[in-house]
Amino acid sequence: MVTVSIVEIFLIISLPLLFFSSFADAGDPLQELISFVHGAVLAVPLLLLRSFFLGYYPPDSALVEEQWMRFFLFDYVFPLFCLPFFLFTSRSLERVSLVSGVSALFGAYTSFFFVHVYTQLNDPDLLARVMTLVLYMTNLLQLHAHVSFSMRTRLPLLGLIAALCIFLLMGAFSATVMTLCFFNARTVVYTSMLAGAGGVALLTHFFAVRINVR
């Protein structure tokens, strides 16, 4: 029981640790931290709204499309709605605000993942939580890399839109993998696919963000 508690704590702090690592070299780390907290707070009303719609998609449903919608829409797309609210409250579409929007999304997905872990504390199987964490980390790194690259172009807003489209495509792929894993016992194959996507995300982030900073 104690071991599970330690693992759960480690899973919960993984996203904030990834955030601090990703934005350690940001121009204004304090501003990025404030944006992270802002996103985490904005996620609260979305979580309440999400709980209302989740009743239409039972977690033990035998329908592939319902499980896919549950993974993609409720665990992945819902936190994205924090971004327009964040940009609206920031009252700015400048490059700094757009990059800070990624920090806000890190906070939003951290809140969603915390609730995801909390609601499954009694489930001894950690696979779903670990895969959800890998999904979030992989795609947030990809988003940060693409947004950082697009901010160096002449049309940063269009670059952000393109980055979000890639983000959604990656999310659809990840949700598909998780759905297949839900209906099939070959977990090693599907976790390997997510791990491969995570490796690509790390390389993309390294070349788009780290090398540019240095």
Swiss-Prot record:
Location within or outside the cell: Cell membrane
Cell membrane among keywords: yes
Keywords assigned by UniProt, alphabetized: Cell membrane, Membrane, Transmembrane, Transmembrane helix
Entry superkingdom: Bacteria
Membrane topology, as annotated: Multi-pass membrane protein
Cellular component, GO, one term: plasma membrane
Protein name: Uncharacterized protein TP_0473
